[in-house]
Amino acid sequence: IGVVVDDSDAERDGPWNQSTRRPNHFGRHYLANAKGKGSHSITWKAALPKPGVYEVRASFCGGENLASNARYVIRHAKGETRILVDQSAKPTIDGLWFPLGRFNFEENAEGFLADKGDNNWVIADAIQFTPVNDLNKKAPLESPNLEDASTAIFRGAYTPFYYGFDGFKAPVRGHYQFRVKARS
């Protein structure tokens, strides 16, 4: 769905390590950099089929020893939005994609990631731009969709997280609303 730009088609600044060590990745491999200081980066550029609102998703493997504060930047029609993502959390869409937000784009879209992290590996795999027409249209632009939650489901970003009450770990910094609904 939409346009996918893999790491092999992205622009790199500085050396990155190609890897297939972790199983969940898009394409033949992903790129990784350890304990970066922000001097290396990767930029995904996409020519979109038409202007409009797109959901931007990042692919990363998730797991131990990955950055808890990967710094993504999405450049869109209204400027740019910076997003911190906990890459140690499992991606929420098919175990491969993590939604970064919905943004209005002209015909060109750009995603950026620097290797500055918290002494752990930063993963750069693929970025997906999916037209909102192909998805649920409820989410507002440039902000997480905090839809009504169902029974014991925590919502953050756009996809429900099925974590227990004792171990909830939000993969993106921000404000969350929790609602509990009792059923008999």
Task: Identify the residue ranges that each predicted region occupies.
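Solvent-exposed serine/threonine-rich low-complexity stretches and specific carbohydrate-binding patches
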Residues: 82-91
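Substrate-binding/catalytic groove segments of enzymes
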Residues: 65-66, 80-82
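A short tyrosine-centered beta-strand micro-motif
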Residues: 52-58, 176
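Preference for bulky hydrophobic residues occupying beta-strand positions
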Residues: 44-46, 58, 72-74, 180
